[in-house]
Swiss-Prot record:
Protein name: Probable tyrosine-protein phosphatase DG1060
Residues of the active site: C101
Organism: Dictyostelium discoideum (Social amoeba)
Stated family: Belongs to the protein-tyrosine phosphatase family.
E.C. designation(s): 3.1.3.48
Transmembrane segments: none
Subcellular location, record wording: Cytoplasm
A Pfam cross-reference name: Y_phosphatase2
């Protein structure tokens, strides 16, 4: 019997939209059950070869947005990458969809925080969710990025129904 162990910092963001850190082979049976169509990978490094093989075997499209190579790793994720990720997230044709970075904390948390802003969540709730996944490693620059993020920069036509329910 296969064990179904979720990846580090796994969470459901919305219907058929998930978040986590980069999985390892113990997590693959769990991910298979999600029947993912696409994965947004936000880490600066390439995903592990094991994970790339899994994605290929499962016929999942891996979208590696990464980070600017010349950017300081302590800085928040770039606005350009967040907007690119949100455009993918807001296209229902990409579902079921999974967002991840190395540990599922900062880059993933920033993208999800900006998504919550599009959903018109209040900042207190957005930061509570960000902190729940970041734990003791909260980065105030990420929270500031989310707070100042201009949602008007994100254009979409046929967004998932849950976007309008908040």
């Amino acid at each position: 019997m296969a064990h179904h162990i979720p990846p580090l910092n796994f969470g459901m963001v919305a219907d058929d939209l998930y978040r986590s850190g980069q999985p390892n082979e113990l997590n693959f049976p769990f991910l298979e059950k999600l029947q993912l169509k696409k994965i947004i990978f936000l880490a600066p490094d390439d995903p592990s070869q094991q994970f790339q093989n899994f994605v290929e075997d499962q016929d999942i499209e891996l979208i590696h947005l990464g980070m600017d190579t010349h950017q300081n790793p302590w800085n928040p994720i770039s606005e350009e990458i967040v907007i690119s990720a949100l455009k993918i997230i807001l296209n229902p044709d990409n579902y079921p969809l999974h967002i991840m970075c190395n540990l599922g904390r900062h880059r993933t948390g920033t993208v999800v925080g900006c998504l919550r802003k599009l959903q018109r969540w209040n900042l207190t709730s957005i930061f509570e969710e960000y902190r729940r996944f970041a734990g003791s490693k909260v980065k105030l620059l990420n929270e500031q990025f989310i707070e100042l993020f201009d949602t008007d920069l994100v254009t979409y036509n046929n967004a998932p129904q849950w976007l309008y329910l908040s």
